[in-house]
């Protein structure tokens, strides 16, 4: 489990050059300043995975905890919680995009509206 903090922009992109496809996610970093990165590597013994799950999670978050279930108290005590006053609203969104890599070596940027800017190929 890993938390990425201090993000300047809210986006990531994963590419599969063999298939020529990628997946990108963009979000407002001022709302979700943390990216939680986790992996499941056949560790879940019970239903429904029975040691057969290989998964990677990349989740934009409002804050992070380091103590599992006791984490909410930790986040509040450290002042990292996202607080909404009674009646206050927060409307936000995430943008997910599937894109063609077009032989590009990688991704330069994913804009807030989900447009993927590929790196230039150097020959």
Residue ranges and their predicted role:
Residues 100-123:
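Terminal connector regions
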Residues 29, 62, 96-102:
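Non-catalytic surface loops within mature trypsin-like serine protease
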